[in-house]
């Protein structure tokens, strides 16, 4: 019996956050590596959260202090981070 091995080259495009711009009122315009852009409104997520480690980002100065790290929006060394797919869909 001969076992056939099929070589299939899979090409997977990983989408990353390339840049982001704070617009105001807890909204950030996110620019993705595939050229797509999404305006993400974080305010409803922050306001409905009951957890103090999330609610602290209702301090606008703290919220605006994000960075792009490993292709994603990141607050305070992974203290607050969202799945890229959720950012892409604008559904937090």
Question: Language-model features: where?
Answer:
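Motif-centric detector for short Cys/His coordination patterns
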Residues: 1-92
């Amino acid at each position: 019996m001969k076992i056939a091995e099929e070589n299939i080259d899979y090409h997977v495009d990983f989408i990353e956050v390339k840049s982001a711009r704070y617009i105001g009122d807890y909204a950030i315009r996110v620019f993705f590596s595939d050229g797509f852009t999404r305006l993400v409104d974080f305010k409803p997520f922050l306001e409905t959260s009951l957890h103090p480690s999330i609610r602290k980002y209702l301090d606008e100065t703290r919220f605006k202090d994000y960075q792009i790290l490993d292709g994603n929006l990141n607050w305070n060394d992974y203290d607050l981070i969202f799945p890229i797919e959720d950012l892409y869909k604008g559904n937090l």
